[in-house]
Amino acid sequence: SNKPAFDTIVASGSRSSSPHSETSMNRVETPIVVDWGARYDHYCSDITRTFIDSERQEEIWNIVLEAQKEAIKTISPGVKFADVDKAARDVISEYGYGEYFIHSTGHAFGLDIHENPNISSKSEGVLEENMVITAEPGIYIPGEFGVRIEDDVLVKKNSEVLTSLDKKLDFTL
């Protein structure tokens, strides 16, 4: 890469319950949400991973992963933006965490890190072949913690996840 696509977001512990947490000098706790991207020849990437270390965090992480998989399954030319959002949101709601999914399921990106369309329930329009979007559902429990998994997806008949980094990363704090 030539440089970062945006300022990296690192949030841990209860601060991870805010999707765009500001940096602090607080001691690192778990989970740790890291959102970063690279810029290459003017084009951006955008990825988020969450490092977890408890059964409760893993339970939430698994729900978010299931929601992301369902969203990615729907990504294809001609599919409504709102339908991609609904696929992720329905999974999270089925587990009783719907009120804690507080942002859109994704967004387009390219020369800028956030481009239209947003992939949300309010978005009108349909996916077009060769768009590049994120799939990034999350659950954010105020005062406790948050979990987000974000990958970049190329819209095709059989859409392709462009992110190659493992979703679940082992670590010791």
Q: Predicted regions span which residues?
A:
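Active-site neighborhoods and metal-handling regions in enzymes and metal-associated proteins
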Residues: 1-173
